[in-house]
């Protein structure tokens, strides 16, 4: 768990283009040079579609991670917060806050409390316009949504999957997390986080994004998990790599007399070169780094909160 006084916050009035974001992230490097430091990025304008969100998060997590890795900072966790202006009311405390120079953000200093405040350099309002991507307005479209995964050493790809899930869900998010006994054949299995630890990190990240959302974490012992038992579920969120499992889920639900689920595919999750991602995101790679690390207390992709 990251110490509160090691957190750094960036507030962005727009989603900046790649070169601008790289420079902004570079400005945080002096403040992040410590083990288990944490970078939170808040995007102020609301996203209207999950397609837009998926695209923006994929680019921003990838660029931010690349900059940090370029400085050898594999231990810095990243959280991108969106559609949650009330984050300033949370109990989080930031050691350093980078704000736009516009006067409209001066009042944020009162709400964010103590900390070092710096103006974002190399940033101009004309630099960026939030990318317009066609797609239905689907914020809070489903009352009850489900997703599943191992969520070992929660990383940027996991966070994109969870972020899109919270975006399309209005009331209840059910997350199946693979139980320990099904992970015995994984590489570097001795470094897999215990089930309770993985649950805690997932819960903390979801609550950071959407505090009012009801979250249910359940052990995943088969392909269907809660989707094969809970009739109220309306949508299943999957990655491209796991989309075939959705067919099995819906076949099982129909056989049991339940309605089939809408399937929402998250296009950018990690591990595929065509997405601009690489294996730097995988839980297996994180465990490999841990195994070879001379400083095991500094966890790569350290969890969010």
UniProtKB/Swiss-Prot annotation:
Listed under catalytic activity are:
(R)-4'-phosphopantetheine + ATP + H(+) = 3'-dephospho-CoA + diphosphate
Matching InterPro entries: Cyt_trans-like, Rossmann-like_a/b/a_fold
Question: TM segments?
Answer: none
Question: What EC number(s) would the UniProt record show?
Answer: 2.7.7.3
Q: Which GO terms describe its cellular component?
A: CoA-synthesizing protein complex; cytoplasm; nucleus
Tell me yes or no: is Membrane among this UniProt entry's keywords: no
CDD domains listed in its UniProt record: PPAT_CoAS
> Where does the record place it?
Cytoplasm; Nucleus
Tell me if Nucleus is a UniProt keyword of this record: yes
Choose any GO biological process term that the UniProt entry carries and state it: coenzyme A biosynthetic process
Quote the SUPFAM superfamilies the UniProt record gives. Answer: Nucleotidylyl transferase
Predominant place of localization:
cytoplasm
Gene3D superfamilies, alphabetized: HUPs (3.40.50.620)
Keywords for this entry? ATP-binding, Coenzyme A biosynthesis, Cytoplasm, Nucleotide-binding, Nucleotidyltransferase, Nucleus, Transferase
**Pfam families found in the cross-reference section:** CTP_transf_like (PF01467)
User: What does the similarity note say?
Assistant: Belongs to the eukaryotic CoaD family.
The function of this protein is: Reversibly transfers an adenylyl group from ATP to 4'-phosphopantetheine, yielding dephospho-CoA (dPCoA) and pyrophosphate. Plays a role in the physiological regulation of the intracellular CoA concentration.
This one is known as Phosphopantetheine adenylyltransferase
Give the organism, scientific name.
Saccharomyces cerevisiae (strain ATCC 204508 / S288c) (Baker's yeast)
What is the phylogenetic placement of the source species in the record? Answer: Eukaryota, Fungi, Dikarya, Ascomycota, Saccharomycotina
């Amino acid at each position: 768990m990251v110490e509160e006084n090691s957190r750094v916050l960036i507030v962005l009035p727009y989603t900046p283009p790649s070169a601008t974001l790289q420079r902004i992230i570079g400005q945080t490097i002096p403040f992040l040079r410590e083990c288990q430091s944490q970078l939170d990025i808040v995007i102020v304008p609301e996203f209207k579609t999950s397609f837009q969100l998926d695209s923006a998060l994929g680019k921003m997590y990838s660029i931010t991670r690349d900059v940090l890795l370029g400085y050898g900072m594999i231990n810095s966790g990243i959280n991108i917060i969106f559609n949650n202006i009330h984050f300033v009311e949370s109990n989080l405390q930031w050691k350093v806050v980078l704000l736009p120079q516009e006067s409209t953000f001066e009042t944020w200093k009162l709400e964010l409390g103590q900390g070092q405040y710096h103006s974002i350099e190399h940033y101009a309002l004309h630099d960026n316009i939030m990318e317009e991507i066609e797609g239905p307005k689907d914020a809070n479209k489903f009352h009850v949504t489900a997703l599943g995964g191992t969520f070992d050493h929660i990383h940027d790809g996991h966070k994109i999957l969870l972020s899109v899930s919270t975006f399309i869900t209005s009331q209840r998010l059910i997350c199946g997390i693979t139980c320990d006994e099904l992970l015995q054949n994984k590489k570097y299995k001795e470094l897999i986080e215990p089930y309770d630890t993985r649950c805690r990190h997932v819960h903390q990240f979801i609550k950071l994004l959407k505090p009012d959302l009801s979250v249910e974490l359940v052990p995943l012992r088969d392909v269907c998990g809660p989707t094969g038992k809970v009739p109220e579920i309306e949508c299943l969120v999957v990655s491209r790599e796991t989309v075939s499992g959705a067919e099995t889920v819906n076949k099982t639900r129909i056989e049991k007399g339940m309605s089939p689920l809408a399937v929402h595919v998250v296009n950018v999750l990690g591990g595929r070169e065509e997405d601009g991602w690489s294996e730097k995101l995988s839980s297996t790679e994180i465990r490999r780094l841990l195994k070879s690390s001379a400083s095991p207390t500094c966890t790569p992709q350290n969890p969010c909160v």
